[in-house]
Amino acid sequence: MSHIAKIYTDKDTTLDPMKGKKIAVLGYGSQGRAWALNLRDSGLQVTVGLEREGKSWEQAKADGFTPKKTEDAVKDADVVIFLVPDMAQRLVYRERVQPYLREGMDLVFAHGFNIHYRLIEPPSNVDVYMVAPKGPGPIVRDFYVKGGGVPVLVAVHQNHSGKALEKALAIAKALGGTRAGAIETTFKEETETDLIGEQTILVGGVMELMKAAFETLVEMGYQPEVAYFETINELKMIVDLIYDKGFMGMLRAVSDTAKYGGFTVGKQVINEETRRRLREAAEKVRSGKFAEEWIEEYGRGSPTLSKGLEEMDKSLEEQTGRRLKEIIERGRPKS
Ligand SMILES: NC(=O)c1ccc[n+]([C@@H]2O[C@H](COP(=O)([O-])OP(=O)(O)OC[C@H]3O[C@@H](n4cnc5c(N)ncnc54)[C@H](O)[C@@H]3O)[C@@H](O)[C@H]2O)c1
Ligand SMILES: CC(C)(O)[C@@H](O)C(=O)O
Ligand SMILES: [Mg+2]
Ligand SMILES: [Mg+2]
């Protein structure tokens, strides 16, 4: 492919388009906390908007914010950032944001789900753009505090002001994203690749492969503790090597026996059939069928999600991990 992605870094971006703007961060969970703290530490004016007093409210207060009810945060805001769960955004928009929309306001997303699948259809006189961190919220905060940043994707859906991209990049900079890089994309590309990635590898694929390998060893009579270190705990070290030095760096660090077994057996486990299933999963996202299924599941109170969490919490691998926590923590590097 000849296309080269447009990537922006700190030197291409300025915070100016966000200076003096009143920013409402709706939600104070995984991303909400990271965004509110990073944006505030970057000198921007942030108010946290929440539905009710509770855990998030207390956490925001403990972090030095004075949270407001969602609509009160929105009424005052120039920029509204949606960091409540994807499935909650439609209702929050309809009941707490739409009634207070003014021409020239900005609606900002960290994932394109609600715009791409048309659950939220804003009027044409506001800007709609996205800054999507390519990493979990607590890491977005941790990297920022340590002087780094998690890469982000930026995209513009509506550009009423003519300045939407500059504003997206200003937020990306304040979040720490442009310390690494901000890649320009579309809502469609971000939404589909993010869902495909988390389902097939980041969350679904990795979790199920680790679980399947662990359970296979245990079924064969090996000790759960040995199976846990082999199939779950050591994966971090292997992935860290890939992160730091690429696949070749990882391969240099493991034995020739592991390399040979890896090249031959890996392809038998992750084979054509697995690739066919990956394509099937990706098509289900692209066709909108996954979104339809998730909205329907949410409408029934998310029973499959609750069951998954309950089963994982009780699983032998999770219990074994908890039992080994002390050993794992003792071994963790101290600096
Ligand atoms: N979690 C991540 O690391 C991550 C990464 C990239 C993008 N995103 C995107 O960021 C957005 C926020 O996701 P998150 O995982 O940080 O959310 P989350 O589940 O951590 O959000 C929790 C927050 O939303 C509030 N909340 C929960 N249910 C609510 C409801 N029904 N109505 C109103 N508020 C409610 C909670 O009080 C809490 O403050 C989503 O669009 C998600 O796709 C998340
Ligand atoms: C952190 C992830 C998996 O990358 C994000 O996309 C999410 O939905 O939580
Ligand atoms: Mg996601
Ligand atoms: Mg993601």
From Swiss-Prot:
InterPro entries: 6-PGluconate_DH-like_C_sf, KARI, KARI_C, KARI_N, NAD(P)-bd_dom_sf. Its cofactor is Mg(2+). GO terms for molecular function: ketol-acid reductoisomerase activity; magnesium ion binding. Residues 5-185 form the KARI N-terminal Rossmann domain. Pfam families: KARI_C (PF01450), KARI_N (PF07991). It catalyses: (2R)-2,3-dihydroxy-3-methylbutanoate + NAD(+) = (2S)-2-acetolactate + NADH + H(+); (2R)-2,3-dihydroxy-3-methylbutanoate + NADP(+) = (2S)-2-acetolactate + NADPH + H(+). Residues 186-331 form the KARI C-terminal knotted domain. Residues 308-335 have a biased composition (Basic and acidic residues). Residues 301-335 are annotated as: Disordered. Binds 2 magnesium ions per subunit. Substrate binds at residue 255. PROSITE patterns: KARI_C (PS51851), KARI_N (PS51850). The active site is at residue 111. Its EC number is 1.1.1.383. Pathway: Amino-acid biosynthesis; L-isoleucine biosynthesis; L-isoleucine from 2-oxobutanoate: step 2/4; Amino-acid biosynthesis; L-valine biosynthesis; L-valine from pyruvate: step 2/4. NADP(+) binds at residues 28-31, 52, 56, 86-89, 137. Mg(2+) 2 binds at residues 194, 230, 234. Mg(2+) 1 binds at residues 194, 198. One of its GO terms (biological process) is L-valine biosynthetic process. Keywords: Amino-acid biosynthesis, Branched-chain amino acid biosynthesis, Magnesium, Metal-binding, NADP, Oxidoreductase. Involved in the biosynthesis of branched-chain amino acids (BCAA). Catalyzes an alkyl-migration followed by a ketol-acid reduction of (S)-2-acetolactate (S2AL) to yield (R)-2,3-dihydroxy-isovalerate. In the isomerase reaction, S2AL is rearranged via a Mg-dependent methyl migration to produce 3-hydroxy-3-methyl-2-ketobutyrate (HMKB). In the reductase reaction, this 2-ketoacid undergoes a metal-dependent reduction by NADPH or NADH to yield (R)-2,3-dihydroxy-isovalerate. NCBIfam families: ilvC, PRK05479.1. Belongs to the ketol-acid reductoisomerase family. This is Ketol-acid reductoisomerase (NAD(P)(+)). The lineage of its organism: Archaea, Thermoproteota, Thermoprotei, Sulfolobales, Sulfolobaceae.
